[in-house]
Amino acid sequence: MSNAITMGIFWHLIGAASAACFYAPFKKVKKWSWETMWSVGGIVSWIILPWAISALLLPNFWAYYSSFSLSTLLPVFLFGAMWGIGNINYGLTMRYLGMSMGIGIAIGITLIVGTLMTPIINGNFDVLLNTEGGRMTLLGVLVALIGVGIVTRAGQLKERKMGIKAEEFNLKKGLVLAVMCGIFSAGMSFAMNAAKPMHEAAAALGVDPLYVALPSYVIIMGGGAIINLGFCFIRLAKVKDLSLKADFSLAKPLIIHNVLLSALGGLMWYLQFFFYAWGHARIPAQYDYISWMLHMSFYVLCGGIVGLVLKEWNNAGRRPVTVLSLGCVVIIVAANIVGIGMAN
């Protein structure tokens, strides 16, 4: 396995670790509605950071974006919006299925759809089937899916042992939302594929290869921001128990406390895709679809590890922790299989 591939896998792991931890600061926010908290964090992660970093990277910010036709920018934006819809459905999936089943189904589907649809759309899937390296990377995807399934099973055992139930269990509604979440969340993978002309243009301007994907985030995350912020603002305006004005009428120290924590959560959320771009840059071009598989499987892996570190599994008993550990090992094996396949 080459150093470039190893570093690509490593950066995807770092990004996934940030994704697994990003909600921790949000949990410290006090006396704010979820919608206000999510909006403040989202403005930081989807608008401020993508624009600021792109402005630093590009020699001429406006000239870069105006150089693309609408036919190039629109698919990137729409796939970003598609991914934004997946974000909203993710929370609803947890509500109706519970954390373990919801994560297992949603992440499993988005891993498959986001990973395999890209080579299918590009007409490269038969090449993967007919080459040794391609077949090995596909085997790695399958093993990763098995690992996600094992971690999901560990979560179910934990919930059963600790008496944790879904907020409002509804299998039919939850499954529909989980499938929708899985499909729509893959929009980020599709957006990155559609944004290749933007990456190439950034490289032509002298942007370091590690950073060429970052300017495209202005468009991708702009699409996601409109969906997420629109959802939050509509709820803040229509739901009687929610009030943006009330949330910002608290004591000034508490408002500052909440804004800083929400901004920190937004920063950590953005960093997952900052390092995703670094990892994506190190993956061989013919296997770039693997970036999504690595990100999603490492997200599940890091989520399990973070749960252990935060002692969320302390009262779950030995069996759930053993199953979780097995799932984490399987995901690590999957990453190695994919790495060897890409090296071939």
UniProtKB/Swiss-Prot annotation:
Native source organism of the sequence: Shigella boydii serotype 18 (strain CDC 3083-94 / BS512)
Entry-linked Pfam families: RhaT (PF06379)
InterPro entries: L-rhamnose-proton_sym_RhaT
Name of this protein: L-rhamnose-proton symporter
Membrane spanning residue stretches: 4-24, 38-58, 68-88, 101-121, 137-157, 175-195, 214-234, 259-279, 290-310, 323-343
Location(s), subcellular: Cell inner membrane
The family this protein is said to belong to: Belongs to the L-rhamnose transporter (TC 2.A.7.6) family.
Keyword vocabulary terms for this entry: Cell inner membrane, Cell membrane, Membrane, Sugar transport, Symport, Transmembrane, Transmembrane helix, Transport
Function text: Uptake of L-rhamnose across the cytoplasmic membrane with the concomitant transport of protons into the cell (symport system).
Catalytic activity: L-rhamnopyranose(in) + H(+)(in) = L-rhamnopyranose(out) + H(+)(out)
Annotated Gene Ontology cellular component terms: plasma membrane
The keyword Cell inner membrane is annotated on this UniProt entry: yes
GO molecular function list: rhamnose transmembrane transporter activity; symporter activity
Membrane topology designation: Multi-pass membrane protein
